Amino acid sequence: LASTAAPEAEPELLSAFFELCHRCLVFRPQLLLSLPCVASLFDAAAACVAHQEFQHTRAAITFLCLFLSGTDAANLYRESAAHCLQRSGGTLLRYCVQGLASASPANLVDHQIELLRVIAESAPTAVHGWLVAALADPGLDLGALPRQGAAAEAFVRGAAQQHATVAAFHCVASEFSRVCRGKAR
């Protein structure tokens, strides 16, 4: 995926690949999580998170959500996911924020919010720092949201705190996306 000049040029291939990876995690997690290239697989999926095409982006996000949250059958291999998140979690979160803010179509926002929630649950002590770094990155297009200011700070606080419900987290992240896209209420 990284060797091609345009990774989005083969959306059907990307969709099928990440759907296969997701099914491996569901039915035979040890097959996938014990591969020596698992970190490269994680990075390839992360790179697709802020793409424009719905199907393969959704497939990559669905794979990453299960990869990070795990299954009972994958418990023996959780260190693979933890290592990948420790190594590349900030980059994954940056792609996710980029997708929420402006890069991805609106029909992917709910999927990206779920990925952001899973990242926050999987790395609760790191997510605040990752968010601050992502929002400070001048290369990150935040659309209508000022890089510094009350709205950006509120998003970092809201997304990094432990939420009692999934709905509360969804509310914080969807409001961030609406503000960035110039659709705030």
Question: Which ranges hold each PLM region?
Answer:
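Alpha-solenoid helical-repeat scaffold
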Residues: L1-R185
